[in-house]
Design a protein with these regions (language model features):
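Compositionally biased terminal segments of proteins
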Residues: 1-160
């Protein structure tokens, strides 16, 4: 993980580009877990779900204009690298479209972003955790995220 990568700058640039494109979107993944649970959480990238019907070529152009470099193309996602070094994954999944519609605008470090609801984030994490093809370490992280989202939040004043 690149310690100099700037998640907030990457997120700001991605959100601005998607808004200018008119692409419906919402923050998902570890960043969303941190925002929703109130517990900062290490994550290897920044994940943003975009409506599955978006024009991918227009999206690639918009993110490139915002300073992101395309690093991978997959059936349901595009991977980018922000100029700060932060990896960004844009996810296209028809099952996420209703979740994007239900996403709520929240303030995160002075940035107004749409984040999927806690209930939808738990559903996403449950789906991922039970995927037999998912790496075990990721599935375990998904299960821990579910518990955080359900309120099992550590008290900074509690002992071991």
């Amino acid at each position: 993980m690149d310690e100099s990568a700037d998640k907030l700058a990457a997120l700001a640039d991605v959100v601005r580009a998607l808004d200018q494109l008119g692409a419906s979107h919402a923050v998902v993944g570890g960043v969303a877990v941190g925002i929703r649970s109130g517990v900062p959480r290490a994550t290897i990238d920044t994940d943003v779900a975009v409506r599955s019907t978006v024009d991918r070529h227009a999206l690639i152009d918009a993110l490139a204009a915002a300073g992101l470099r395309l690093t991978g193309t997959f059936a349901h996602s595009l991977n980018f690298r922000h100029s700060s070094g932060e990896p960004v994954q844009i996810v296209f999944d028809p099952e996420f479209d209703p979740m994007i519609d239900r996403a709520e605008p929240l303030d995160a470090e002075g940035l107004r972003i749409r984040v999927v609801t806690t209930a939808d984030l738990i559903a996403m994490k449950q789906r991922a955790a039970t995927d037999p093809a998912r790496r075990r370490s990721k599935a375990l992280r998904d299960q821990a995220d579910i518990e955080l989202l359900r309120g099992d939040v550590p008290d900074p004043d509690e002992g071991w």
